[in-house]
Amino acid sequence: MQNSMHLLRTRRFVPIFLTQFLGAFNDNLFRTAMVMLVIYGIYRDPQQEATFSAIAGGLFILPFFVLSALAGQLADERDKAAIVRIVKTAEILIMLVGAAGLLLQNVPALLFALCAMGIHSTFFGPIKYAILPQHLRGDEVLAGTGLVEAGTYIGILGGTLLGGVLVLQNPDGSFHAKWAAVAVIAVAIVGRITGHFVPPAPPDPDAPPFHFDWHIVRASIRLVSATLHIPRLFLAIIAISFFWAMGAVLAAQFPPLVKNALGADQTVATLFLATFSVGVALGSVAINRLLGGEVSAKFAPAAAIAMGLFVLDLYRRVRVWPGEGPELRDLSTFLAMDGSWLIVFDLLGVAIAGGMFVVPLYAFLTTTVPKSETARTIAANNIVNSGLMVFATLVLTGAVMMGVTVADSLLIVAAASTLAAWLGWKLHLACD
């Protein structure tokens, strides 16, 4: 069995691990600070708050759908390490705009920076997975993928916690995010420094040449069709897409769910986001232990079913929760209430199962195709992922506008998990 921890001592893995960790940390530091500031400090209407959360999620995801084909081609054609350095430099500039939005409490500036960070992540996303087969041995790829996924969610945890803590309340009851504005710029600078040490990852000189297509629509169609015609890749990509769509719905609804269904404040919303992040990180590392380094989908169906069962139990508990009191409950008050720890346990269970579901599928994508095509394969996956995630957020936004409660939206996730389990089973039969 390949122990993943030894990779954290290697020069060929640590720089990309730290760079992607800091990227995830900063994404979520900014997004959490933005959402907390807007929901608790600017808006006062539950429907407006839920709609904002869904729109913000959609704006971040939209660039993945539009620009992933260009990002994948670029990563396969050029040195991936050089692209990392360019992208991390851009992050500093984007966070200057985001910091201004936080300081001025300017919603358009915040949404602009959020969309720009989506573009940043679109170009970095294919690299953080596609670079692994170039720097790691074949029996290390699953371990490396698990660590990257775990690092991503630990970064989400850290950024989420700090983003929630740095949105502070003034004596007059208003909120500010001054320290969050400083933090997002500082983290972007550190990420650029770690990106400087990523080892070179040039394109394969023996790979067949391909024509770089700058036409966004045509390139996207060609890339997706060229990838999805392979049945195993089709099943893996659709299964991953269902996971991310479910995650998008859950993440978008955590703050309004906590405030409007559970009657709790931003500290509880931060706990929910943090719990989810820890769970995915635990599942990402645990699955490598279970599989012994083997790239296999044999646990995917059970993991997806477990996700659905935990979501259903979460829905059941939220439905019978006492609801709002005279004022929003803080973290200690919430945790002292009957059933609160079971809600947290359900969230943790959903996340652990999710990490165990998705990590082998990513490893499968990067090991099934030649190294010269890994970035484009991940990019095709990102296009399909983002398309389904945007569709999910649109459905969620429409459902909220039609009067569906935040709690009832959990049923959408539970239903999607059954389809994810079926896809995981089909992939297991096709590949294992």
State each model region's role.
Residues 9, 76-77, 103, 134, ...:
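Membrane-helix boundary and inter-helical linker elements of multi-pass secondary transporters
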Residues 52-54, 59, 66, 77, ...:
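C-terminal transmembrane bundle of multi-pass solute transporters/carriers
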Residues 33-64:
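Extracellular/periplasmic helix-loop-helix junction of adjacent transmembrane segments
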Residues 107-114, 118, 143-206, 279, ...:
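Hydrophobic alpha-helical transmembrane segments
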Residues 1-14, 201-238, 261, 327-336:
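Juxtamembrane intracellular "pre-TM" segments in multi-pass secondary transporters
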Residues 14-32, 56-94, 109-168, 235, ...:
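Substrate-agnostic recognition of the 12-TM MFS/MFS-like secondary transporter fold
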Residues 40-43, 104, 108, 197, ...:
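Juxtamembrane transmembrane-helix termini
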Residues 96-100, 164-165, 192-193, 223, ...:
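Alpha-helical transmembrane segments of multipass membrane proteins
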